[in-house]
A protein has these predicted regions:
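Electropositive polyanion-binding surfaces
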Residues: 2-4, 10, 31-436, 444-447, ...
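Compositionally biased low-complexity segments enriched in polar/charged residues
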Residues: 449-451, 474
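Boundary/activation segment at the start of structured domains
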Residues: 1-30
Length: 474
């Protein structure tokens, strides 16, 4: 089966699941009653335009939510984590905000343009990248002193409303950032800081071993209409882990900040897994922990009252670092602005009621789960397409898989490796065979010589895998 047919089926079966694309004319109407500045705007900002700002993102990224700077001042070393501030361009009483409430998240169909949560104009104004709106951008910044010996945060962490200057030269891909570790002091110091942050988290949770996992993913060659499995280099992985640790540090600080300054209400990201984690053996690998998380149904959720996120090791945790693509983070930003402004504007209204916060948490849980399921289907489709490309190129293909559960009707399988590549691919077969006892979590290998394009069900997509189980039930 050729790629043209796969791509045609993707356009028919997968892309529509993400929903309707943004309409330029409708976005113009949304912007008409978006009057800014509005109630929660911050006019008095700390000027950090003299600092070198770095952003590290995937190739082709337009919606850069986060950046950082590391610098010395008064013989002290500082880490500043800068988060884009789209809410400064959004009136909370506008039709635009209602549209964002409905969208909840940005959707990312593979090898396609994103379906942004907000109109392009707002996205580009907020994005911490040089674009048609210039190189001076607004940010909410987490500032901490760093110990020059241990590279751990010390002293009081500060929350600042800032303006920063971004640079095209410092907008790096993970690959280019990784290549500059040895030559760029800021990048190398950032890596040292992130490793110290990870070591501190390892004292609180076994979840840090998830950082070990490197999942291969399809990489597209649109010029030649093909794809292949790609594994990040060691330096690319280290850059992704660095940015992740900065985000966890910022989200944990903001979670604590909201608990203290907003009476424990807000929009928190939680995962109640402490008791379960205590049952996991101490030397477990990242891949084995991920398998156990899947089998045991461990999941993170949004709630409107404070509670721990045990997988990241934080007693309070929120989503603050991706406001261009997540409603939850925008809500968090408005709450931070309210806390900042209420000391000088005594009659300032709280932006959201408790009922609204509860609704937001429910909407975020529902939409996040829905989009994650769509992304699983998307990834599955593209990996099957990539296996097809490998077979067309006469490559040998061996998969490793294991059974996660059997419900009495559906057999749930995870494909965890394709040749040397670690992947995560769910595969479900309908089998009415209560007599067979399936070995759960036992990894087995299977050579594959053909695949078919995914249709409504998984069965028939990998015939040789089907035959391992379906022939037994005949």
């Amino acid at each position: 089966m050729n790629n043209t047919l796969f791509n045609s089926n993707y356009d028919k079966l997968i892309e529509p699941l993400y929903g309707i694309k943004r309409n330029i004319e409708e976005d113009k109407l949304l912007l008409q009653d978006n009057i800014v500045p509005s109630t929660y705007n911050i006019c008095d900002r700390v000027d950090m335009t003299k600092q070198s700002i770095y952003s590290i993102d995937p190739d082709g990224c337009e919606d850069a939510d986060d950046a950082f700077s590391i610098y010395e001042e008064n013989d002290k070393l500082w880490l500043a984590i800068h988060i884009a501030d789209p809410t400064e361009h959004i009136n909370i009483g506008s039709s635009l905000w209602k549209n964002i409430e409905q969208n909840v998240v940005t959707r990312y169909p593979s090898n396609k343009k994103p379906i942004h949560m907000m109109p392009n104009e707002i996205m580009e104004k907020a994005s911490l990248m040089v674009n048609q709106y210039g190189d001076i951008k607004l940010a909410i910044t987490i500032l901490t002193e760093i110990d020059k010996e241990t590279y751990q945060p010390i002293g009081k962490v500060k929350l600042l409303f800032t303006k920063i200057k971004v640079s095209k030269n410092n907008a790096l891909s993970y690959m280019n950032a990784g290549k500059s570790i040895e030559s760029n002091t800021i990048i190398s110091n950032g890596l040292k800081i992130s490793k110290s942050l990870q070591n501190l988290r390892s004292l609180k949770t076994k979840g840090v071993v998830l950082n070990e996992i490197s999942i291969s993913f399809p990489k597209y060659d649109n010029l030649n209409n093909t794809s292949h499995l790609y594994l990040d280099s060691v330096t690319e992985i280290s850059m992704k882990q660095m940015i992740a640790e900065f985000a966890i540090f910022a989200n944990s600080f903001i979670g604590e900040y909201l608990k203290i300054n907003f009476d424990g209400t807000g929009l928190y990201r939680i995962c109640s897994a402490k008791d379960w984690l205590n049952t996991v053996y101490s030397e477990i690998s990242g891949q084995d922990l991920l398998n156990e998380i899947i089998v045991n149904g461990i999941k993170a959720e949004y709630i409107s009252t404070v509670s721990p996120h045990d997988l990241v090791g934080a007693p309070e945790y929120t989503h603050f670092t991706s406001p261009i693509r997540r409603l939850s983070d925008c809500v968090c930003h408005y709450l931070l602005k309210y806390i900042h402004l209420k000391s000088t504007i005594h009659d300032l209204c709280v932006p959201f009621t408790n009922d609204q916060l509860m609704k937001y948490s429910n909407d975020c849980v529902r939409l996040t789960k829905s989009i994650k399921n769509i992304q699983y289907k998307d990834t599955k489709f593209r990996i099957i397409q990539t296996i097809n490309n490998m077979l067309i190129n006469n490559e040998n293909v061996t998969i490793q898989y294991y059974v996660t559960s059997y419900t009495g009707l559906y057999l749930n399988i995870i494909i965890c490796n394709i040749n040397e590549h670690c992947v995560y691919l769910s595969y479900t077969l309908r089998i009415s065979d209560l007599q067979t006892k399936y070995e759960i979590k036992l990894v087995k290998s299977l050579d594959i010589t053909r695949v078919n394009c995914i249709d409504k069900f998984d069965e028939g997509t990998i015939p040789e895998l089907d035959n391992v189980f379906i022939t037994k039930s005949v």
